[in-house]
Amino acid sequence: MGYVVSTFYRFVHLSNYYDIRPVLKEFCVQNNIKGTIILAEQGINATIAGSQNSLDKFFSFLDLDSRLCNLQYHKSFSRCNPFSKMKVKLRKELVCLGIEDFDNSVSGEYIDPENWDNFISRSDVYTIDTRNSYEINFGKFKNSINPETNCFRDFPDWAISWAKNKIDDDPIIAMYCTGGIRCEKSTAFMKDLGFSKVYHLKGGILEYFKSTGNINNLWEGYCFTFDDRIIVDDKLVPGDVKCILCGAHVMLEDMKSISRGHVLCFSCKDHV
């Protein structure tokens, strides 16, 4: 039996987010749903996996809360469950930019996946990858800018430095990330710096793959995922991953030692 993998987020005020945690955890465990849900006062961010029936029940359960109803989510499939347990975490920030009291409500404009290729192919558009370097090493859009960050908290420093030579020209900026949440927050930061023409890929890379299949081959390589699939290709099929030490192919079932994109097979892990 295959598994459905669902990725979703929403920026919404959840004053009682700490009370939601045990309720969601219990529901997921009872319905054999695994993955990670992050709750903060700013909203919800999650990747979960289970049967289609279980996930249908989950989203119907969320619909009971007006703040979380009608969530749009990305759906893909996996032969094995890419998660070993269910985690519901509480965070100060939904996605950590490292700036206190930052208001990300005024973010950039969406570009639909079907229009993305034409948009980033324009000579007057700067395409910025808001992911971390270890993710970008697996794949990226052609000619996109790599901020060379190790974590999302590094992005503001890079953006401030990059803006020094660009802000007066007010260029067109296109931003993207895995599922959409980081580029939504980073576009708000770029607008806060003074850029006015800021856009981002709706639904992120995963939705782009699902909607377009990378028909124009503007995506190069794989997309890193934050689960045991590690990487997926533009057809959302888990990729062929190699151990960083011995170069041996690592099967999905053996990919249990993963840290920031570094994959170790069990044999090498025993000797590290």
Curated annotation (Swiss-Prot):
EC number, UniProt record: 1.14.-.-
Active site: residue positions: C177 (cysteine persulfide intermediate)
GO terms for MF: oxidoreductase activity, acting on paired donors, with incorporation or reduction of molecular oxygen
Record carries keyword Flavoprotein: no
Catalyses which reaction(s): uridine(34) in tRNA + AH2 + O2 = 5-hydroxyuridine(34) in tRNA + A + H2O
Pfam family, one: UPF0176_N
The keyword Oxidoreductase belongs to this UniProt entry's keyword annotation: yes
Residues in Rhodanese domain copies: 121-217
Keywords of the record: Oxidoreductase, tRNA processing
Secretion signal span: none
UniProt-listed PROSITE patterns: RHODANESE_3
Gene Ontology process terms (BP): tRNA modification
Function (record text): Catalyzes oxygen-dependent 5-hydroxyuridine (ho5U) modification at position 34 in tRNAs.
Family: Belongs to the TrhO family.
HAMAP family for this protein: TrhO (MF_00469)
UniProt cross-references to PANTHER family, sorted A to Z: RHODANESE-LIKE DOMAIN-CONTAINING PROTEIN 7-RELATED (PTHR43268:SF3), THIOSULFATE SULFURTRANSFERASE/RHODANESE-LIKE DOMAIN-CONTAINING PROTEIN 2 (PTHR43268)
Identification of the protein by name: tRNA uridine(34) hydroxylase
Gene, per the UniProt record: trhO
